[in-house]
Regions:
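Helical segment within the ABC ATPase nucleotide-binding domain
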Residues: 172-186
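Conserved ABC ATPase signature
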Residues: 132-136, 140
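Conserved ABC transporter NBD signature motif
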Residues: 57-65, 77, 111-115
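ABC-type ATPase nucleotide-binding domains, specifically the catalytic core motifs of the NBD
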Residues: 13, 69, 94-113, 121-126, ...
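ABC ATPase C-loop
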Residues: 149-150
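Helix-to-loop junction immediately C-terminal to a conserved catalytic motif
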Residues: 49
Length: 236
């Protein structure tokens, strides 16, 4: 098991954001986590990457107690978090943003290979490598945010709402590139996404979070056939 989250609870000022959440991710798996706004999906990612502290429960990554490891060291273990809202460094160029993603020892030793892969996945970034990130379109900034994650040479890549605010055609392109990264590179992916149909279609296994709890889980086939999922999230 690459990642095991067991009975994880997280609170903000006494307000419970996650309540006893358990998630299991095998190496090479593509896992989707879906649910409404405020369900705790982003909080789950922040707990994995160490941005917010866990109140109780456990997170184990490749046999290590992740909660005992400082956030800045988790990237060295091969965990990369592509945050909601892209959060690129607007005043830096595209190439400088990618270099920032490669600051870890993993990223530095594989920089040349990774940059070639990033530019193969997102050719527009190669064309605009000297352009300031703040002048890119929303879709291009999302490509850059994903590329910055890839630059760290991750074994586990957390993708938080990569389609947020994007035109449908651009969101479709982003999903296609994410699927290619998983299929061709074997990177273990956890995707948080509100475009539920696309997320469940792409994943091997999925979880539905509501009000900070896992209410459903299963293969993409099982979840897309589930009446509750079809009514609440797929409009069927």
């Amino acid at each position: 098991m690459m990642l095991a989250i067991e009975k994880l609870s997280v609170s903000y000022g006494g307000l419970a954001a996650l309540r006893g959440v358990s998630v299991a991710v095998e190496e090479g798996q593509f896992v989707a986590i879906v649910g409404p706004n405020g369900a705790g999906k982003t909080t789950l990612f922040k707990a994995i990457s160490g941005v917010v502290p866990a109140g109780s429960g456990a997170i184990t990554y490749e046999g290590r107690n992740l909660l005992a490891i400082p956030p800045y060291e988790r990237v060295h273990l091969g965990i990369a978090h592509v945050p909601e809202g892209r959060q690129v460094f607007a005043a830096l160029t595209v190439l400088e943003n990618l270099e920032m993603g490669a600051y870890s020892s993993r990223g530095r030793t594989t920089w040349h290979r990774n940059i070639e892969r990033i530019f193969a996945l997102f050719p527009v970034l190669a064309e605009r490598r000297r352009q300031l990130a703040g002048t890119l379109s929303g879709g291009e900034q999302q490509m850059l945010a994903i590329g910055r994650g890839i630059a760290s040479s991750p074994r586990l890549l957390l993708l938080d709402e990569p389609s947020m605010g994007l035109a449908p055609a651009i969101a479709d392109l982003i999903f296609d590139r994410i699927a290619a990264l998983h299929r061709e590179d074997g990177v273990t992916l956890i995707l948080v996404e509100q475009r539920v149909a696309e997320a469940l279609e792409s994943c091997d296994y999925g979880y539905v979070l509501e009000t900070g709890q896992v209410v459903l889980e299963g293969t993409h086939t099982a979840l897309t056939a589930n009446d509750r999922v079809r009514r609440a999230y797929l409009g069927m």
